[in-house]
């Protein structure tokens, strides 16, 4: 039909590592329970955006993020030598993610030829928190956190439904997350990039800081080798926002006998800058 030319197909971001990770089970005798990730959304956007295809796409991406993180967290736990159980674990991993989406300066414009559309700016901020808890002594826990945000606000220009029926060139609004109205490809790419950056950042933080099951009770060297199958993925690197301004990984430890961790002072400073709560998006 005539409307198809208004749309561009943009596939969903691929969270899968290019090389599947092979896990050789290690019989450490240490078990872990993985709780489902708790997602908390905090949105501040216009009613127009509520019905836009980008909003539908972001919701779908959040589902994919959760599903893929849960799969890879399981892989990392197995790589570290834990046996995954659902009852009576030695340790528990609790993960929560908060996603803040903000639309600024939304302005509606009407045009006889092209219908009604909204111009605005969008920002997204992710914060992840993973607690590694000793099930036999819940005072004994390690807290890992990761955060990522869009480098800058993304300029949007999206069509909205016109109620008065006068317009002879009505724009069809897509409700399919991979079928975007023309002009939304670049914003979608920037949004996808931030999801992928947060995904990788969170997994690397966990991989670098989760103690090996065989090392529990010993001093753990802090290696920064990274989660191999992700580090080897060159396409990931190209699409990552700048690491310095954007991401920080921090480790906070409640006093524990058997899981020493070494938070570096730079991480601590980074974190306080990001959590001053004044302005999330510059």
Where are these regions (language model features)?
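A structural "domain/chain start" motif
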Residues: 1-75, 174-282
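A generic structural signal for short, solvent-exposed coil/turn residues
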Residues: 24-26, 85, 118
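Sequence-level detector for tyrosine residue identity
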Residues: 45-48, 82, 91, 100, ...
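Short secondary-structure boundary motifs at beta->alpha junctions and helix caps
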Residues: 52-59, 114-121, 135-205
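Short flexible/disordered coil segments
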Residues: 73, 77, 95-104, 145-168, ...
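A short, well-structured beta->alpha microelement
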Residues: 74-88
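Surface-exposed short loop/turn segments
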Residues: 87-160, 263, 271-275, 280-281
